[in-house]
């Protein structure tokens, strides 16, 4: 009985330490989602927009950014300010890093919004 317990523990360890393929399932799952989002560009009336349901004067901008690849969208919108914020965070090393980063983002958002007026695909 001790041999069975030991072999069961070894089998459990092997299962726990086995690496799962990270890129293949995510890529295959993301491809159909992107295809579906490109086919249907209208948003149902019961779905709130990213701006909290507020209507903006330029309705074409959200549609343009939805067709831009995720990496390009993030690189052109939030990565620059996040890199600056993380640099300041590493330099200052405050006691409350999340609050520090949140305050940095709120304090500097207008400067980065002015720099990113053009959507990613229109440069």
UniProtKB/Swiss-Prot annotation:
Description of the deletion phenotype: RNAi-mediated knockdown suppresses the growth delay and elevated body fat index of the TOR complex 2 mutant rict-1. Results in disruption of the invariant transdifferentiation of the Y rectal cell to the PDA motor neuron.
Compositional bias segments (type: Polar residues): 38-73
Compositional bias of kind Low complexity: 18-35
Subcellular location: Nucleus
Family, as annotated: Belongs to the dpy-30 family.
Role played: Essential for dosage compensation. Required for the sex-specific association of the dosage compensation complex proteins dpy-27 and dpy-26 with the hermaphrodite X chromosomes. Plays a role in developmental rate and body fat regulation downstream of the TOR complex 2. Required for the robust transdifferentiation of the Y rectal cell to the PDA motor neuron during larval development.
Protein's name in the database: Dosage compensation protein dpy-30
Primary gene name: dpy-30
């Amino acid at each position: 009985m001790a041999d069975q317990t030991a072999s069961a523990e070894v089998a459990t360890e092997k299962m726990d330490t086995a690496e799962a393929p990270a890129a293949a399932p995510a890529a295959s799952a993301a491809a159909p989602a992107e295809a579906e989002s490109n086919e249907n560009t209208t948003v149902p009336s019961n779905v709130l927009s990213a701006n909290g349901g507020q209507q903006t004067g330029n309705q074409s901008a959200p549609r343009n950014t939805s067709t831009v690849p995720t990496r390009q969208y993030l690189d052109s919108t939030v990565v620059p300010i996040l890199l600056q914020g993380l640099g300041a965070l590493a330099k200052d090393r405050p006691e409350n890093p999340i609050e520090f980063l949140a305050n940095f983002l709120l304090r500097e958002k207008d400067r980065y919004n002015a720099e990113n007026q053009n959507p990613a695909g229109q440069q």
